[in-house]
Amino acid sequence: MRKVSFVLAAVLAATSLFAARNAPWTKEKAWEWYNAQPWIRGCNYMPASAANRVDQWQELGSEARFAEVECELALAETIGFNALRILVEEQGFGVWLVEHDGFMARFERMLSIMAKHKMRAIVVLGNDCSRPKEIWTLPKPGVQQYDVGYHGGRRRTQHGSFPGAVGYTVLDDPELAPKFYRMCEELLTKYRDDDRILFWNLWNEPGNNNRSPLTCENLRKLFDMAWRIDPKQPLAADIWRVRGQHAEGRSPAEKMAGELSDIISYHCYGNLQMQQQTIQALRARWGRPLVNTEWLARINGDEVFTSYPLFAQNRVGCTCWGFVAGKYQTYEPYESMWADQFTYKRPDAPVTKWYHDLFRPSHHPYDPKEIDVIRRVNAQMDAEREGKSLRAKIAKSCKITGEDMWYGYRRTKFEFKGRKAWVVEPSCTPKKGIPWTWTMQWAEAFVDRTGVPDLLAKGYPHVTLDVFDTRMDENGLKACAEFQDFLVKELGFVKKCNLIGMSWGGFFSTRYAAAYPQNVRRIYLDAPLLNFDGFNAMAIGPWAASAPADGKWTADPRMPVNLAPQVVKGDIPVLLLYGGQDQTVPPASNAELFAARFKAAGGRIDVEKRGGFGHHPHGVDPNKTARIVNFVTTAK
């Protein structure tokens, strides 16, 4: 302990040289720092063989554990992670107290391995996830016990096992509390200028386990210390219970965390809608960069497929909970979730899914599709930073007008030669050559019934261009051909597209395919308008100026019902669905006439007449889109 005291004395002497501050960074400085970083993404990390954070930091078994860390961080590097949230808190403090020099050496070694694999540390010091005093013991090095089959390796955890109880921590012990602060001071001082530290997450979930009245004073004390040391990295404490407009959390401790933080670290384990609402609420309230330092709860609907692209789209940093499944067992549900099953509070909760974690002990993914999404989104964000992303390519020649999430996928809106256009990117790796789909009209209608989201999930980008004012006359054809040329030459899409034509979109698709058969691979038509007979002049736009003298469009060679042979000549297969009771676009003079002529010309056409259907709804039930998807993805 004399050596520890000597080290701490040196630390205290060093801190007196620092230029202290007494408030959070300005918002401008916070954003300047954040914008200088790549998109932050990673996980909360503990080696799979560690039963808890005592195991993570203690001498016992450390050599084997560091070999494991090397393998696991190499795995994290392959999927594009660049940050790890590592918790020291009171379990690490228990090691620091007994094995001070060894702890500091192992902390340094951890940072070095992380840097080797291109990752930086988010370091957690305080923690309010705790259990009542009656069962609390000071964490100590040695063999760590754990219960098999329980979240966190404990039968009785801080996650709902003690409702109403106040958690107990080392900061409640008058002898241990000063020593805990010394540990924090030593780490903050030693690494205040170290680029391997991304930021200091000073407190995990302040106010959890009913500790808010106790934590406010401690939280302020730790921030005051950190301000005196003034590291070059930002400081943050977690807001972890954001609900709707409650962007300050639900306790004084959380509100204080937001008020003291340079950047906002928050936790959200909710579904896509809740994630979106949380981001909006936090941005509106705090106006600072956001990092969701805990997410991924499949049982709650917090999925990689939806949340991860959302964070990227909104430039919100994120670290999921868990990496390789191990002794800590956070892939298991909370015990309270099992109780909800047995008492029928949440009988439909999918508790057989993994709750957290990404990889199995074998290092095979829990779900390979999740890892593909993570890799793809990471690559997209890195490419964007380098000016090589799809969005960046679009921005070279077009004005970006907006970005959003469209059915869980990133959509970039832009102007193409004065017309509204957008491209939706798949989150997974695109198919070789980037095959794609194009809804030519009504691109926002009946989307989940058209198979488009399913095709995005398979790696097919989706696009549209607004040419409705032309009703696909010669000007519309030219505009679409120029748009496709842009997509192929500038964005790397394959030469031939898969067209989706609902109602007016059927008119557009067939005319385009007949004019540019070399540009079209397949067409899915749904209740298509293929003939103007029965339409008034107001509906057909510029076509009214060239209407047949007798008003009969069926014989007009420009009508799609008369273009079937040209489409067949282009060897373009067609899937045609229509309603037998369609009063808007009568089948006899549209779908059925086209189908008959298409077949007569020797074309490949799959027709389904749905006798009880009218013009709407287009598409098929969302759980029956396989027919459309298979049609588009079939090789020939």
Which stretches of residues belong to each language-model region?
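Active-site mouth of glycoside hydrolases
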Residues: N22-S261, R285, W295, I299, ...
